[in-house]
Amino acid sequence: MLTKLNHVLLAGVVALACSSCQTEKKADYQVIPLPQEVVLTQEKPFLLNKNVSITYPEGNLLLKRNAEFLSGYIRQATGYTPPVKGLKDGETAKHAINLGLDADIANKEGYVLTTTSEGILINGQTENGVFYGCQTLRKSIPAEAQGADILLPAGSIKDEPRFTYRGMHLDVCRHFFPLEFIKEYIDLLALHNMNTFHWHLTDDQGWR
């Protein structure tokens, strides 16, 4: 009887330990497409949890939209929704993901993603560049992390597209697709940093 009780207690301890292990998951910057430069440091990682907010310069509606996109992506993966806040000039936010513009970044679609234990900064020359930085951050988060805190390694990521035109073709003239599929298709293009949706809408097989 005592042996059975010991087995039950041991199983409970193991289950509890495994459960606690699942409360934190580590992000991975090995994403597709792979950024041009990823430099990690030995500093403490940034902890992405339900207390994190996403900020953008107040008045910039495109960056606000990027922030809302990123908040939605994080909600899909973790189950919690980071609040989105606009910051006035000179304002700062602690333990936040901050979106901004940096004219010193050479490429119009380039971005720099910097991670410290205090926060994450995603800068781009344009709002498009910031969007691609958000996509890289999104892809680094485990796809299934419901209720978990995410550890994002400290360091910096610098990236810019190799090709100006990056797109995919979809022929809906010969092969019909429902509207929801097309929306999902466009989302997948954005996920992989493509910037052109080649939509083949009409055709005339009898044209000479």
Residues covered by each model-derived region:
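Short secondary-structure capping/junction motifs at helix and strand boundaries
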Residues: 4, 144-148, 194-199
